[in-house]
C-alpha cells in the first residue's frame, strides 16, 4: 500500500474503505486538538464514505461538514478552494472521483497546506498503477477500499480499508502497525 500511495506508513487495515475514510477525519480532529472543526468533503466523494463520516461525527454539535452544496467544475476544484480556510481541519477528495474522472489535485493541495489543513485522498489502489500517487500531489493521508486488489466477494464481503499517511501522522494513526525495528540495544 505504501508503494502504491507513495506514503511512508500503512496500517494493518480497517473494516472497509468508508471506515478508513472516517478514521482520517478522527486523525485530523486529534491533529488539531479539536481546535479546527471544519471538514471539507468533495461532492464527488463516494456517498457511502460521506455518510460514514457523518455517522462518525453525528454526536459532535460543533463539527462542520461542508462541500455538498458546492457545485462547479471538478477539473479545477476552484469551488472547493473558496471554502478552505483557517478553521478547516481536513480537505477530502476522491481520485479518481466517484464518477470516474481524474483531476489535477495540485492547486487543492497547495490551498489546503497554505491553510495548514490536511489533505486526504480516497483512491482506488488499482488505478494507482497508472496514475500519480496521492503523495505526488502532496496528500497527507491516502485511504480507500482494498477489495479491488483481488478479494473475492462472498455474501457482501469481505472488504478491507487501507490507510496510509506521512511519517508525521503515525502517532495519531488508528489501527495496528506491523513492522520491523531495532530495540534500545540496536538488535
Predicted features and spans:
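Short loop-beta-helix segment that forms the pyridoxal 5′-phosphate
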Residues: 2-23
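Active-site nucleophile and cofactor-binding loops and adjacent substrate-binding regions
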Residues: 12-18, 42-45, 148, 153
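PLP-dependent aminotransferase-class I/II
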Residues: 15, 41-101, 107
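Catalytic cores of nucleotide-enabled group-transfer and carboxylate-activating enzymes in metabolic
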Residues: 20-27, 34, 38-42, 54, ...
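Generic beta-strand/beta-sheet core signal
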Residues: 42, 67-69, 91-96, 118-123, ...
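Catalytic PLP-binding core of fold-type I/II PLP enzymes
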Residues: 102-141
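Active-site C-terminal subdomain of aminotransferase-like
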Residues: 149-187
Amino acid at each position: 500500500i505504501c508503494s502504491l500511495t507513495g506514503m511512508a506508513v500503512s496500517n494493518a487495515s480497517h473494516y472497509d474503505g468508508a471506515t478508513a475514510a472516517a478514521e482520517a477525519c478522527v486523525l485530523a480532529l486529534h491533529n488539531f486538538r479539536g481546535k479546527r472543526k471544519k471538514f471539507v468533503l468533495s461532492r464527488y466523494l463516494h456517498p457511502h464514505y460521506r455518510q460514514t463520516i457523518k455517522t462518525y461525527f453525528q454526536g459532535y454539535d460543533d463539527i462542520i461538514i461542508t462541500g455538498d452544496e458546492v457545485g462547479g467544475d471538478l477539473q479545477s476544484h476552484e469551488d472547493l478552494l473558496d471554502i478552505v480556510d483557517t478553521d478547516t481541519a481536513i480537505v477530502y477528495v476522491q481520485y479518481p472521483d466517484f464518477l470516474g474522472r481524474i483531476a489535477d489535485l495540485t492547486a487543492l493541495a497547495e490551498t489546503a497546506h497554505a491553510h495548514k489543513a490536511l489533505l486526504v485522498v480516497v483512491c482506488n489502489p488499482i488505478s494507482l498503477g497508472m496514475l500519480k500517487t496521492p503523495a505526488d500531489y502532496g496528500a497527507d493521508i491516502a485511504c480507500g477500499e482494498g477489495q479491488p486488489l483481488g478479494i473475492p466477494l462472498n455474501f457482501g464481503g469481505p472488504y478491507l480499508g487501507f490507510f496510509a499517511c506521512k511519517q508525521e501522522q503515525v502517532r495519531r494513526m488508528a489501527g495496528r502497525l506491523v513492522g520491523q525495528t531495532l530495540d534500545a540495544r540496536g538488535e
